């Protein structure tokens, strides 16, 4: 980067107006699943404008900016192409990618992380079934995962048989989900089965429809009866407290100060 700093510094000093100036150098390595480098890039930007990039076919830096900074991009490209040390390093870009990535490639790609699984009801779509389940699977690595559904232990087809690709979370883990449309019946058990290399055994998550209609009716009647009983009991206690206690009250001005004994 030192080789082209004078050019970028000159451009910065020649610009007017408020704000800062940023020179950005980006180098990337594209590797396949085995860790073999497939592509190498090296680009230079100024204030987010891409100026020049390494052209592997021409073995030189080529301008990428064709707007107001085109002249700068050409001058910068010509200047960098005269730097033999830089040119040699860029020609060996793919080889350097392999050298720099292999020491930690295994620790990053050979690791595994088991998935977290949860089954929940969701809004049905593209189906006449009244209920739809979603099996959420997240936080796993690598991306390959198998999701199947079972009803009372027997395999059933998901809502869509199309293969779904796991989506990256941005933290070296992935997420995906599977749907199942159904008409629930009392006593049925639906199970989402997730198989992944990070889990020693398949992960099972069950879902049941809940109470039967008769049970729901009985529970509702019992709840209403209990509520009415509590209301009646509360009203009785309030009425009793307001009425006070009935007892004998002697009249004032008794004519028999010593009392009267009747035998």
Curated annotation (Swiss-Prot):
Spans annotated as Connecting peptide: 208-218
Membrane topology: Single-pass type I membrane protein
Subcellular location, record wording: Late endosome membrane; Lysosome membrane
One MF annotation (Gene Ontology) recorded for this entry: peptide antigen binding
Impact after mutating residue 65 to R: Decreases the interaction with MHCII and peptide exchange
Effect of residue 162 to E: In allele DMB*01:02 and allele DMB*01:06
Keywords per UniProt: Adaptive immunity, Disulfide bond, Endosome, Glycoprotein, Immunity, Immunoglobulin domain, Lysosome, Membrane, MHC II, Signal, Transmembrane, Transmembrane helix
Signal peptide: 1-18
Keyword Thylakoid (UniProt): no
Segments of this protein annotated with the region Beta-2: 113-207
Top-level taxonomic group: Eukaryota
SUPFAM superfamilies: Immunoglobulin, MHC antigen-recognition domain
Keyword match Membrane: yes
One Pfam family it belongs to: C1-set
Segments on the Lumenal side according to the record's topology features: 19-218
Cytoplasmic compartment residues: 240-263
Motif range (YXXZ motif): 248-251
Transmembrane regions listed in the UniProt entry: 219-239
Effect of mutating residue 248 to A: Abolishes targeting to endosomes and results in relocalization to the cell membrane
Domain notes: The YXXZ (Tyr-Xaa-Xaa-Zaa, where Zaa is a hydrophobic residue) motif mediates the targeting to the lysosomal compartments.
Similarity comment: family membership: Belongs to the MHC class II family.
Subunit description: Heterodimer of an alpha chain (DMA) and a beta chain (DMB). Interacts with MHCII; this interaction mediates rapid selection of high-affinity peptides in a pH-dependent manner, with an optimum at pH 5.5.
Name recorded for this polypeptide: HLA class II histocompatibility antigen, DM beta chain
Native source species: Homo sapiens
Encoding gene per record: HLA-DMB
């Amino acid at each position: 980067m030192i080789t082209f700093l004078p050019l970028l510094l000159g451009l910065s000093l020649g610009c007017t107006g408020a704000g800062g100036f940023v020179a950005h150098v980006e180098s990337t390595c594209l590797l396949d699943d085995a860790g073999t480098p497939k592509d190498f890039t090296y680009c230079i930007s100024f204030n987010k404008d891409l100026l020049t990039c390494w052209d592997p076919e021409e073995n030189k830096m080529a301008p990428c900016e064709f707007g107001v900074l085109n002249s700068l991009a050409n001058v910068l490209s010509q200047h960098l192409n005269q730097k033999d040390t830089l040119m040699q390093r860029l020609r060996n870009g793919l080889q350097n990618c392999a050298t720099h990535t292999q020491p930690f490639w295994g620790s990053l790609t050979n690791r595994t992380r088991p998935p977290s699984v949860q089954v929940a009801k969701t809004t049905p779509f593209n189906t006449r079934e009244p209920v739809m389940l979603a099996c959420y699977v997240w936080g796993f690595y690598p991306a390959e995962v198998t999701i199947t559904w079972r009803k009372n232990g027997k395999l059933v087809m998901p809502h869509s048989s199309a293969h779904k690709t796991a989506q990256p979370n941005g933290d070296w883990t992935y997420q995906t989900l599977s749907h199942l449309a159904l008409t629930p019946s009392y006593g049925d058990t639906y199970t989402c089965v997730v198989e992944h290399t990070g889990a020693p055994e398949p992960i099972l998550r069950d879902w049941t429809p809940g109470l039967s209609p008769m049970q729901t009716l009985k529970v509702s009647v019992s709840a209403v009866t209990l509520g009415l009983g509590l209301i009646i009991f509360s009203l009785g206690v309030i009425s009793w407290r307001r009425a006070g206690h009935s007892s004998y009250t002697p009249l004032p001005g008794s004519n028999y100060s010593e009392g009267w004994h009747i035998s």
